[in-house]
């Protein structure tokens, strides 16, 4: 979902960076994902996310890692895409640091509160 945005940034030589949180840790959701979408490897890879079993634990590791990157890079805008815990952590980290947040896929709803993603969409 962010691949077209990344391609356009690259085409226009706009400064940007990609953070891979490791939330999806199978080979089909990692290196293959970047290859299939014709994306270069991400500049940043967080570790330890897959080691956490709970949503809270994963989100905490991502929040801490993303915050560290944002403090180092200080972008004017941080884009997130989707409804996974990665996006919740990224948006929260950026907002707490007074960095603008852009959300690709904002407004999508299922109204199924049994899904963790629905909670992330609303927050």
Per-region residue spans from a language model:
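Non-catalytic terminal and connector segments of soluble metabolic enzymes
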Residues: 11-14, 39, 43
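N-terminal beta-loop-helix "entrance" segment that forms/cooperates
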Residues: 22-40
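Short internal beta-strands
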Residues: 15-23
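Active-site and donor-binding regions of nucleotide-sugar-utilizing enzymes
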Residues: 1-10, 32-33, 45-123
């Amino acid at each position: 979902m962010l691949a077209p945005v990344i391609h356009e940034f690259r085409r226009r030589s706009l400064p940007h960076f990609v953070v891979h949180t490791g939330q999806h840790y199978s080979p089909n959701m990692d290196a293959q994902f970047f290859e299939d979408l014709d994306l270069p490897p991400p500049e940043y890879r967080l570790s330890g996310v897959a080691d956490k079993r709970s949503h809270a634990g994963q989100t905490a590791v991502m929040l801490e890692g993303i915050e560290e990157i944002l403090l180092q890079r200080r972008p004017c805008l941080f884009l997130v895409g989707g409804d996974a815990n990665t996006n919740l952590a990224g948006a929260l980290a950026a907002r707490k640091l007074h960095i603008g947040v852009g959300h690709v896929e904002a407004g999508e709803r299922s109204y199924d509160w049994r899904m963790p993603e629905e909670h992330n969409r609303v927050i």
